[in-house]
Amino acid sequence: MIELKNVSKVYPNGVIGLDNINLTIEKGEFVAIVGLSGAGKSTLLRAMNRLIDISDGDIMINRRSITSASGKELRMMRRDIGMIFQNFNLVKRSTVLRNVLSGRVAHNHTFRTLFNLFPQKDVDLALQSLERVNILEKAYTRSSQLSGGQQQRVSIARALAQEAKMILADEPTASLDPVTTKQVMDDLKKINTEDQVTVVINLHFVDLAREYATRIIGLRDGKVVFDGPAQRATDEVFKDIYGRPLKEDELLGKEVG
């Protein structure tokens, strides 16, 4: 469970990133966060994992405050949170397998992981994770040789190997073509339904949010302006979230179907 209580973020230049956010996300939900660029989507997601510090309020992960956590407690809390970024965050010169094994770092002694000395059970788990996202054949390929879609699937495999209880995905399909976008979204949905892993994802494309999410949260100027089931997110609702009618480039279109 993720709980945000009166969460605000004000940047040093005075820009308000988040404005008194109150949310509860239950285990096993698939939540899409939508809104215009600058609405606070990335700020919200990064605050959940303490990649940025909030200015006010509290964020609870499974009833423990990540806002006040530090040291070992913070590391242990982050171990349960898988992050997937738009730019993949892979070590390009390393093999796919080594990138996936990085998801096991928090489960092992630091000295061993510095020298890539992982137990065989971790290697087996990493290979199984690659198989689940249909990219096992690339295990010993350098990550720099993969397409964007393949790199994003490696990121998902890393979260699987991490045995994350929740996945936070920051516009993971933004740089992908429609076919690859569907593959990545299918992978995330499968993990959500089969493993009961909570997924919170920032999305640009409105129709993707409607198709894959069970719940949609709309942000505007750092505030929650919509929070409800995906089926209630009509074009009129999105007009309210965005403050204007939808544009063509905010719909991926029939190519995904």
From Swiss-Prot:
GO cellular component: plasma membrane
EC class of the enzyme, as a word: translocase
GO molecular function terms listed in the Swiss-Prot or TrEMBL record: ABC-type phosphonate transporter activity; ATP binding; ATP hydrolysis activity
Positions of transmembrane segments: none
Record-annotated ABC transporter domain positions: 2-246
Catalysed conversion reaction: phosphonate(out) + ATP + H2O = phosphonate(in) + ADP + phosphate + H(+)
InterPro entries (alphabetical): AAA+_ATPase (IPR003593), ABC_transporter-like_ATP-bd (IPR003439), ABC_transporter-like_CS (IPR017871), ABC_transpr_PhnC (IPR012693), MetN_ABC_transporter-like (IPR050086), P-loop_NTPase (IPR027417)
The protein's Enzyme Commission number: 7.3.2.2
Residues where ATP binds: 35-42
Keyword Transcription: no
Lipoprotein found in the keyword field: no
Known role: Part of the ABC transporter complex PhnCDE involved in phosphonates import. Responsible for energy coupling to the transport system.
Stated family: Belongs to the ABC transporter superfamily. Phosphonates importer (TC 3.A.1.9.1) family.
PANTHER family reported in the protein's UniProt record: AMINO ACID IMPORT ATP-BINDING PROTEIN, PHOSPHONATES IMPORT ATP-BINDING PROTEIN PHNC
Subunit structure: The complex is composed of two ATP-binding proteins (PhnC), two transmembrane proteins (PhnE) and a solute-binding protein (PhnD).
Protein name in UniProt: Phosphonates import ATP-binding protein PhnC 1
